[in-house]
C-alpha cells in the first residue's frame, strides 16, 4: 500500500506491506522492482489513471459525512492556503492531470534507489538478507 503524507514542502511517500519474516528481503526487492518497472517498462496506463480518478472522485461524498471529517477538510484549506471553495473544486482538480503529467511527476518524484527503509522484525533472521540486497547503509536501532 502506498500513500503520500500531507505536508507543506517535502512530503513523505510511504509504502507499507505486512510480510512474513522469512520473506522480508524478497518483499523489499519486489517493491523496488515494481516501482522501477512503473518508471520504465510498465508505466501507468490511461485506463488505470481513469479508474484511479473515478475511485477518488466517487469516494469524495463519504469523506465528509462526519463533523470531524468536515473539520479536517476545512483545516486543510487553512493549512495549505487553498481557496475557500476548494472542496467544491476537488472533483475537477482530481480529474485534471493528464497521463503525460502523471508519468512525468512519477519520474520526477519516485526514486526507489534513494528510499529510506524502516523495517521491523527479528534482526537475527532478516539482517543478513537485507544487507545482501545492497539498497544502502543499514543502521540497526534497538
Question: Which role fits each region the language model picked out?
Answer:
Residues 1-40, 46-99, 107, 112-120:
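M16 family metallopeptidases and their MPP-like homologs
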Residues 28, 116-142:
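His/Glu-rich zincin catalytic helix
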Residues 33-43, 132-141:
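A common structural junction motif
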Amino acid at each position: 500500500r502506498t500513500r503520500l503524507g500531507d505536508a507543506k514542502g517535502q512530503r513523505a511517500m510511504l509504502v507499507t506491506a505486512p510480510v512474513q519474516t522469512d520473506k522480508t528481503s524478497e518483499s523489499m526487492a519486489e517493491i523496488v522492482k515494481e516501482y522501477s518497472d512503473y518508471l520504465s517498462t510498465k508505466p501507468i496506463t490511461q485506463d488505470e489513471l481513469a479508474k484511479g480518478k473515478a475511485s477518488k472522485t466517487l469516494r469524495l461524498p463519504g469523506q465528509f459525512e462526519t463533523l470531524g471529517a468536515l473539520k479536517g477538510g476545512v483545516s486543510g484549506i487553512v493549512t495549505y492556503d487553498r481557496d475557500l471553495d476548494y472542496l467544491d473544486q476537488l472533483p475537477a482538480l482530481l480529474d485534471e492531470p493528464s497521463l503525460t503529467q502523471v508519468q512525468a511527476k512519477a519520474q520526477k518524484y519516485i526514486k526507489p534507489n534513494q528510499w529510506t527503509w524502516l523495517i521491523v522484525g527479528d534482526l537475527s533472521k532478516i539482517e543478513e538478507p537485507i544487507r545482501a540486497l545492497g539498497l544502502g547503509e543499514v543502521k540497526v536501532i534497538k
